[in-house]
C-alpha cells in the first residue's frame, strides 16, 4: 500500500460521514480513532450514498473486527480488506468494499513529509538517494496518529563508525495537536519541530549527533492539497548559490533518471525507416511501438510508424489488466507517412485524434495536412477519408471524419479530430483553462464511443506537447475515478509514460504547466462542490438526523467527480447505537478477485 493517510486522527463519526458524503464517492473509506472505546478504531465506508461504520478492536496484541482475521497493524488490516473483495460483509450478506482511501490532509505541505512509509522503505530511500544529514518525516506504522523522523547518519557513503549504513528513527508524538519527541519542548506543527531541531541537533544516547542538514523530498501529493505543493515549488531559492529549487529541481531530478530508460529503438534506426522519422533521433521504443499488420509481406519495413502505445497502468499489462483508456503518442505526419497514419488509426480502431500543433509554426512545417478539406473525400493509399463537417470552438477545431478501407464499403467508421490551435509557438499557455476544457470534450467523446481504441495524440515530434496533454489527462482521470483526496505523483506519472515513449514532457515550462492544470481542475471542482452544497441547503429543510441517500446525478455529463450533499454538521449528533451497522464475521474464501 502506497499511502496510509486514510487514517484521520482527529475526527468524529459525524465529521467522517460529512467528509465521505461531500468529498468521497461510493467505495471511499477512512479510519479514525474510536470515541466510544479509546484505543480502538473505526472504519467508515461510503456505500450507496450512505456511510457504514465498522468497529476495529485493538487488543494490544493484534487488530481485528471483533472476530475474523487478526493483523499486526491497522495498515495490514485495511490493506487485506482492500485487496480481498468479498471478505468483508454485513450479516445480511451484502459486501462492503474498500475501494478508494479518503486521505487525511497532510499535517504539513513541506516536501520532506512522505506520509505512509515503512522504516525499511525510509532506510532504503535515505541510503540510496540521501547523504549524511539527509532526513524525512513519515507516519508511524506502530502508533497511528504519530510520526517518525528518519535521519541518515555516518559519512557520505552512508556508513557509521562500524562500516555499516546507519539511519536513525526518532518517534514524534502528536498529543492534543502538539508535537514532541518524547520530552522537552512541544511544538504547534511538524514544521516548527523540524526547524527547531535543524538549529538545535538532537544527540543519541550513544553520543551520535542527529544533524538535519538537507531534506529528502517526496513528489507524492494529495490532489486536494496541490495548491500548497505548487506554493512550495514556486518558492525562490533561499540563497543565490542554491540553484536547485522547486520546479526546476524536481524536473532536473526527473531528467537524470533518463539513463534508466535506454530501451532499444532498432526499428526506427533501420536505414529503410529513416525517412519516416521527422527527427532522426526521436524514435519509438521497440517494445511499445505500434506495429502495422496490413502491409506488403514482401516489404518487412511496411509495419513501421513512429508511434508508441501509452498505457496509463503500464505495470499491470503483464497481469493482463487492460486500462480503461490508452493512448497512441506519435509524431506529426510527413508527406510520406500519411498513408501509414491512417492505416494505424484504422487498425487500432482509434476514434479520437488530438492534434496539438499548427501545420506550420515560425515558418517551419510541424505536420502536413493529413485530412481532406471540408465536405471533400480523399484516398490515402488503401484508406479513404471523407470530411463530413468542421466546427470551430474558441481554442480548437473539431472535424468529423469518415474513415474506411478502399473497396470495403462496410468498414466505414467515424473518427473525430480535435485540433487544438492556441498553444503558443513559444512556451506554454498562460491559462490552463482552455486546455482543460479541450481535454474535457475529448474525454466525453472517447467515453461515448463503445469499444473505442486508443486516443491518438500528436504534435510535431510527438513527445513535448503530446506528453504534456497525455500526462494531464491521466492525472485528471485518476481524480475523476478516486475523488479529490487521492494521491497523485507528477514525476512518477511522467516517468511511467517515458518508459513507453522516450522524452515525453520536454521542458520545465511544460512540467510546471502540468501542475498548474491539475491545480486549476481541483479548484474548479472544489468550487463546484461548495456551490452544490449551498444550493442543496437552500432548497431543503432537514427535520431529522438521517443522512440523504440520494446521489447527486444529472442527465448531462459532468466533468467532475460525483458528490452527495449532507446536512450541516451542527444538526447531527454522534450516537453509537445509531452510527454502527451490524457487520457479520468474514467468511473464509479460497479465491480472491
Curated annotation (Swiss-Prot):
Its annotated function is as follows: Acts downstream of various receptor and cytoplasmic protein tyrosine kinases to participate in the signal transduction from the cell surface to the nucleus. Positively regulates MAPK signal transduction pathway. Dephosphorylates GAB1, ARHGAP35 and EGFR. Dephosphorylates ROCK2 at 'Tyr-722' resulting in stimulation of its RhoA binding activity. Dephosphorylates CDC73. Dephosphorylates SOX9 on tyrosine residues, leading to inactivate SOX9 and promote ossification. Dephosphorylates tyrosine-phosphorylated NEDD9/CAS-L.
Protein name per its UniProtKB record: Tyrosine-protein phosphatase non-receptor type 11
Assembly and oligomerization: Interacts with CD84 and with phosphorylated SIT1 and MZPL1. Interacts with FCRL4, FCRL6 and ANKHD1. Interacts with GAREM1 (tyrosine phosphorylated); the interaction increases MAPK/ERK activity and does not affect the GRB2/SOS complex formation. Interacts with PTPNS1 and BCAR3. Interacts with phosphorylated LIME1. Interacts with SHB and INPP5D/SHIP1. Interacts with KIR2DL1; the interaction is enhanced by ARRB2. Interacts with GAB2. Interacts with TERT; the interaction retains TERT in the nucleus. Interacts with PECAM1 and FER.
GO MF annotation list? cadherin binding; cell adhesion molecule binding; insulin receptor binding; non-membrane spanning protein tyrosine phosphatase activity; peptide hormone receptor binding; phosphoprotein phosphatase activity; phosphotyrosine residue binding; protein kinase binding
* Family annotation (SUPFAM superfamilies): (Phosphotyrosine protein) phosphatases II (SSF52799), SH2 domain (SSF55550)
List N-acetylthreonine occurrences by residue: 2
Hydrolase as UniProt keyword: yes
Name the domain of life.
Eukaryota
Q: In which tissues is it expressed?
A: Highly expressed in brain, heart and kidney.
Description of its domains: The SH2 domains repress phosphatase activity. Binding of these domains to phosphotyrosine-containing proteins relieves this auto-inhibition, possibly by inducing a conformational change in the enzyme.
Amino acid at each position: 500500500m502506497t499511502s496510509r493517510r486514510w487514517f484521520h486522527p482527529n475526527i468524529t463519526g459525524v465529521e467522517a460521514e460529512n467528509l465521505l458524503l461531500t468529498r468521497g464517492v461510493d467505495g471511499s473509506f477512512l479510519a479514525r480513532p474510536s470515541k466510544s472505546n479509546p484505543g480502538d478504531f473505526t472504519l467508515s465506508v461510503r456505500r450507496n450514498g450512505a456511510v457504514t461504520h465498522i468497529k476495529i478492536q485493538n487488543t494490544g496484541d493484534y487488530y481485528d473486527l471483533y472476530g475474523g482475521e487478526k493483523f499486526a497493524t491497522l495498515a495490514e488490516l485495511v490493506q487485506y480488506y482492500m485487496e480481498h473483495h468479498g471478505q468483508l460483509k454485513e450479516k445480511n450478506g451484502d459486501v462492503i468494499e474498500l475501494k478508494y482511501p479518503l486521505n487525511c490532509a497532510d499535517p504539513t505541505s513541506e516536501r520532506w513529509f512522505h506520509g505512509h512509509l515503512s522504516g525499511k522503505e525510509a532506510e532504503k530511500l535515505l541510503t540510496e538517494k540521501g547523504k549524511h544529514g539527509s532526513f524525512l518525516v513519515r507516519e508511524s506504522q506502530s502508533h497511528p496518529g504519530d510520526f517518525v523522523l528518519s535521519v541518515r547518519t555516518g559519512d557520505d557513503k552512508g556508513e557509521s563508525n562500524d562500516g555499516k549504513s546507519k539511519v536513525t528513527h526518532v518517534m514524534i508524538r502528536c498529543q492534543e495537536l502538539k508535537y514532541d519527541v518524547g520530552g522537552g519542548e512541544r511544538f504547534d506543527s511538524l514544521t516548527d519541530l523540524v526547524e527547531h531541531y535543524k538549529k538545535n541537533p538532537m544527540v543519541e544516547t550513544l553520543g551520535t549527533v542527529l544533524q538535519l542538514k538537507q531534506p529528502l523530498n517526496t513528489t507524492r501529493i494529495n490532489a486536494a492539497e496541490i495548491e500548497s505543493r505548487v506554493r512550495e515549488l514556486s518558492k525562490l531559492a533561499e540563497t543565490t548559490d542554491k540553484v536547485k529549487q522547486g520546479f526546476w529541481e524536481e524536473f532536473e531530478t526527473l531528467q537524470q533518471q533518463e539513463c534508466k530508460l535506454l530501451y532499444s529503438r532498432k526499428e526506427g534506426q533501420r536505414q529503410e525507416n529513416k525517412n519516416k522519422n521527422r527527427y532522426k533521433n526521436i524514435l519509438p521504443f521497440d517494445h511499445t511501438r505500434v506495429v502495422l499488420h496490413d502491409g506488403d509481406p514482401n516489404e518487412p519495413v511496411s509495419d513501421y510508424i513512429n508511434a508508441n502505445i501509452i498505457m496509463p497502468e503500464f505495470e499491470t499489462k503483464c497481469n493482463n489488466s487492460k486500462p480503461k483508456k490508452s493512448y497512441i503518442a506519435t509524431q506529426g505526419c510527413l508527406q510520406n507517412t500519411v498513408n501509414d497514419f491512417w492505416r494505424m488509426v484504422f487498425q487500432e480502431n482509434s476514434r479520437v485524434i488530438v492534434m496539438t500543433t499548427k501545420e506550420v509554426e515560425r515558418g517551419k512545417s510541424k505536420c502536413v495536412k493529413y485530412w481532406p478539406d471540408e465536405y471533400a473525400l480523399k484516398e490515402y493509399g488503401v484508406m479513404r477519408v471523407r470530411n463530413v463537417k468542421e466546427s470551430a470552438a474558441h481554442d480548437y477545431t473539431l472535424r468529423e471524419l469518415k474513415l474506411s478501407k478502399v473497396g470495403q464499403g462496410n468498414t466505414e467508421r467515424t473518427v473525430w479530430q480535435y485540433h487544438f490551435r492556441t498553444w503558443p509557438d513559444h512556451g506554454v499557455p498562460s491559462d490552463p483553462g482552455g486546455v482543460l476544457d479541450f481535454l474535457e470534450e475529448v474525454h466525453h467523446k472517447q467515453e461515448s464511443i463503445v469499444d473505442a481504441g486508443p486516443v491518438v495524440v500528436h504534435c510535431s515530434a510527438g513527445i513535448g506537447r503530446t506528453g504534456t496533454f497525455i500526462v494531464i489527462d491521466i492525472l485528471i482521470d485518476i481524480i475523476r475515478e478516486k475523488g479529490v483526496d487521492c494521491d497523485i505523483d507528477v514525476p512518477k506519472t511522467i516517468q511511467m509514460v517515458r518508459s513507453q515513449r522516450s522524452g515525453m514532457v520536454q521542458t520545465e515550462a511544460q512540467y510546471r504547466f502540468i501542475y498548474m492544470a491539475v491545480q486549476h481542475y481541483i479548484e474548479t471542482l472544489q468550487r463546484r462542490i461548495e456551490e452544490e452544497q449551498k444550493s442543496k441547503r437552500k432548497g431543503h429543510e432537514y427535520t431529522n438526523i438521517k443522512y440523504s441517500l440520494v446521489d447527486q446525478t444529472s442527465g448531462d455529463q459532468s466533468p467532475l467527480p460525483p458528490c452527495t450533499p449532507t446536512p450541516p454538521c451542527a444538526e447531527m449528533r454522534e450516537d453509537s447505537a445509531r452510527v454502527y451497522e451490524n457487520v457479520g464475521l468474514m467468511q473464509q474464501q479460497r479465491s480472491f478477485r
